[in-house]
């Protein structure tokens, strides 16, 4: 049996596969698009990639039994689908690679068909190796794990020392674009939908019409060959600038210099070894600078493997983590993109349109607002898992609950990554023309990020005071007098009582402009400010600490 995120013909499931006597079983089931409200783009990617993979196996002459979502006798769950296949085919044995999600592993381990679960060779760190790394450590930190992985796999190493003489070049990868913007951004290597993908889009529109998001401009790789082409395009065209601008954001530019291959990796269309090797080869050939290559490899070899280790070590209780006792419902605008704050409108709008946002948009825009607002972690987790095409639970949950929300109390991150709107202003042009001023914490034009930042520190002062890394931010909080704190608390309360939006601010459904590709999509503004928009006047600085910029952090994208 092959699951939707196991599309690797070289996996352990196919060891000793004999086409004369063996068969492959795959299934599309409603439950996998229902247990969280999967977005149209995410569901399209999974189903199209599965169908392409099944077709490729069939073209080899292999027997493939495939349950489609619209089959008359289709079952509702994967467990039911497996039982139906076993009843119909009566195999001598059922084998499958271990599921990447706790929910499915538990379901199959208890299944009466008793499938034999095989290790997942896709990953560069086994469960046993991560357990050995974690043994005896009071706290786990990705940086130390990453160095071990570099040494074990001989990646970016010159003998026994790291290439260039240091392990981490994150300090060199923090640039914003400046007033002129990103300049010419290399075009993304999108793939026009073929007949299979178009059929899936039509099926989902008829069977699951209420899915969030869109698939009108779906162009994600759905085959291994397409994924390899996307990797090659990134290495050649965008990797050289990736390091400098991996944290930067710009209106109307959803793709920038990022790789856009996480979905292909997480469906196993790409192998992390080939991805890491391609990046290192580019540096050694002089085609990309070391800081860019090291920063990218850290995402794949470091963060991606690390969050998987954290997930399996912390489950099953991890999904219920709520260390800060956050109880605010996730605002409805996360599902619509209709919100007056320009940064949220941009980040959420492109997320719904493409199923994609890069790691800083996820961590320091949508994730930051949920943290400061005090949104229920399980609801935020469901949103991230639903919306993004690359979201699978083992990688999404630790990034969302641990990095973005600090709901795990410090398992993933050493501190909450809290900041005012000034961080977003520094790293993007989102604040230009926005009605809210990131320098203000109170008043009708105060940025909600800034208001909620100070309120967050005040509400959690006792807890955060036990964290030495929060000392500077709490010192700044102590400079605010009682009147300022009272005004901040009152505005924060009003924002929470109004579904996360300042009272009277209304909503903004779309941004318009000359760029037809962006103007048609809610929340996606053109690359320039909207015609007639005047710059927001700067208010007098007041309670303006931008917080601490995240370091050694990645929501892998």
Predicted regions and their residues:
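Beta-rich, aromatic/charged-enriched effector core domains that present basic-aromatic interfaces
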Residues: 77-220
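Glycine-rich phosphate-binding "P-loop"
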Residues: 62-77, 336
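C-terminal catalytic domain of photolyase/cryptochrome flavoproteins
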Residues: 3, 229, 248, 252-557
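N-terminal beta-strand-loop-alpha-helix module at the start
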Residues: 1-69
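A structural signal for the main folded, soluble domain(s) of proteins
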Residues: 62, 69-71, 84-88, 92-94, ...
